[in-house]
């Protein structure tokens, strides 16, 4: 079932800017392994669900998957063949605004090889470049860019 907000204050939102890196959610917090975004992009609720299904099917219901992003921004679209003007289009779907360095998915309770392959399958469903990260590398300071 696709992720959608239960209720929202405003149906239509501005597009906004995606400058800079993520402010929070940059470390693996729940599982042992994570999938980190290397680019900023909108990720739709269907792409999130496709990545989740790919991971859980590969793991054969073993381990646990945490989804660290949620599609809370609506995007609009006008009908095909509709001319410019006459207002903003109707809401067409939901997206999560993902900035670079954000941990999008986490896995726990499986081996590193299984987690690495599951994350590779999940990354193939997403429109951005991703990186496999481990919790112990971040705790040891391996997540810095000074190396």
From Swiss-Prot:
Transmembrane segments: none annotated. This is Large ribosomal subunit protein uL16. The keyword Transcription regulation does not apply. Keywords: Ribonucleoprotein, Ribosomal protein, RNA-binding, rRNA-binding, tRNA-binding. Part of the 50S ribosomal subunit. It comes from the Bacteria. NCBIfam families: rplP_bact. Binds 23S rRNA and is also seen to make contacts with the A and possibly P site tRNAs. Gene3D superfamilies: Ribosomal protein L10e/L16. One of its GO terms (biological process) is translation. GO terms for molecular function: rRNA binding; structural constituent of ribosome; tRNA binding. One of its GO terms (cellular component) is cytosolic large ribosomal subunit. The gene is rplP. InterPro entries: Ribosomal_uL16, Ribosomal_uL16_bact-type, Ribosomal_uL16_CS, Ribosomal_uL16_dom, Ribosomal_uL16_sf. CDD domains: Ribosomal_L16_L10e. The lineage of its organism: Bacteria, Bacillati, Bacillota, Bacilli, Lactobacillales. Belongs to the universal ribosomal protein uL16 family.
């Amino acid at each position: 079932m696709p992720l959608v907000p239960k209720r929202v204050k405003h149906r239509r939102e501005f597009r906004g800017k995606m400058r800079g890196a993520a402010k929070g959610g940059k470390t693996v917090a729940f599982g042992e392994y994570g999938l980190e975004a290397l680019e900023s992009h909108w990720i739709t609720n269907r792409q999130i669900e496709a990545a989740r299904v790919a991971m859980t099917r590969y793991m054969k219901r073993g381990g646990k998957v945490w989804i660290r992003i949620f599609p809370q921004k609506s995007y609009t679209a006008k009908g095909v063949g509709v001319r410019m003007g006459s207002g903003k289009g109707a809401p067409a779907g939901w997206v999560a605004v993902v900035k670079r360095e954000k941990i999008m998915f986490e896995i726990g309770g499986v081996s590193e090889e299984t987690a690495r392959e599951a994350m590779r399958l999940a990354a193939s469903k997403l429109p951005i470049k991703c990186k496999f990260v481990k919790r112990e590398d971040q705790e040891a300071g391996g997540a810095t860019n000074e190396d």
